[in-house]
Amino acid sequence: MANSPQAKKRARQNEARFQINKARRSRIRTFLRRVEEAIASGDKEAATAALRAAQPELMRGVTKGVFHKNTAARKMSRLAARVKVLG
């Protein structure tokens, strides 16, 4: 348990940041899931639109420190390759 005022404040800040990051991560995962669903349905136009919507969200997650930039780049690259293959 935090004893000093500073430690108590850090605990409060950590919890607040955790909740914010949790919401951001959930939002990004939702966008990525929409791309996955569009790919699974085989609809190239919907998949492309979903990918275009997901990319800025994922990059925003990088800017905010939720994801590492290489992780985001890898996810976008793999999704883009799968969308490109759709006929």
UniProtKB/Swiss-Prot annotation:
Pfam families with a match to the protein in the record: Ribosomal_S20p
Keyword Protease: no
Keyword entries, A-Z: Ribonucleoprotein, Ribosomal protein, RNA-binding, rRNA-binding
Gene3D superfamilies linked: Ribosomal protein S20
InterPro entries: Ribosomal_bS20, Ribosomal_bS20_sf
GO terms assigned for molecular function: small ribosomal subunit rRNA binding; structural constituent of ribosome
GO cellular component: small ribosomal subunit
Protein origin, superkingdom: Bacteria
Protein's GO biological process: translation
Classification via NCBIfam families: S20
Family under the similarity heading: Belongs to the bacterial ribosomal protein bS20 family.
Job of this protein: Binds directly to 16S ribosomal RNA.
Protein name: Small ribosomal subunit protein bS20
Lineage summary: Bacteria, Pseudomonadati, Pseudomonadota, Alphaproteobacteria, Rhodobacterales
